[in-house]
Amino acid sequence: MTIERFRQLWTHRYFKYSHILKAHLLAYQAWIYFKKKKAKFAPGQELIAIVRTEHFGDIVAAEPISRYVRSLHPNAFIVWFVKPSYHELIDFNPSIDETFGEFCVTQRRILFEKNVFDKVYPLQFSNNNHCAKCQVFLDNPIADRKGINVHTYFNFGNLLEVFAQTADLINSRTPFPADDQPRLYLQDQHRQKADSLHLPENFIVIHCQSNYAPKDWPAARWDQLVQWLSENYSYHIVEIGLKSNLTTKESSYRNLCGQLSILETAEVIRRADFFIGLDSGPSHLANAGGTTGIILMGSLGAFPSYNPYSGSYGRQENAFFVRQEGKMCSELSCEFVKEKVANALETSALTKGE
């Protein structure tokens, strides 16, 4: 072993085991915190945990579960476990008493082993319950028993139905038993931010990159779509997301990528006439906000066709899915997408005019 390789190995081990030690310490700290909190509860009051830590589209899709769990445990103190970067999606939810910013799955595993929570609803399965630094997966026995994993989950319904099954809230392949329309809890601060942007009266929001490349549509085709929209419609085009990969110079185009929080983005989408995007987090914001959506989709792994949405998008009441059976999103031609977008804009205009 070379000296450089030796140094790399021990640097890796140092950071790994320092991380694991911190996870253990934070778990014990959280256990003491919840133990003290529980000691102040009224007799019979339960401490309930809901676990959906990422990604933000999944958290939005799972929002109806918070209301359903509250209906099952009206007097309980309900805590939602989430990655700190997504806490704002939970902070303002009136069905949740506390947002817990999770350090990593090891912290959660140790905390739950202390049995301070009376009931845990895990909305995750092992494949998306992972800490790269600890190099461990955290299994969900309920999901394992039902055969729900990253290779099968869309065989069990939309995301809301899948998460409800992984928590044993519903039986396999059964509809969600309560209101399945996701909600957002936007505050004045989010509305004020949107006001400060001085958005045009009529605009379309676009989102061009997901967190998973196989769901994406090529940037060059997005540029063509923006040009076509600008030449044929009076709408302004507003792009949202983390970072733009477009090169368009259209005067009607505005880039807001990287400038907004999740809920500020949601408010911008809510004000739009249309949302054109991918199967990604912002499309779930559009569903929850009630904005008509045009969603570019394709086959995904073992799923040649799937529907991740519940509520109005799931029923395609105000959503148009742009896809071709068996083709990946990247394989959709620009002409095909333009045709479907034109049909959706026309259909929606006719519906609004009735």
Language-model region placement:
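Catalytic machinery of carbohydrate-active enzymes
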Residues: 1-354
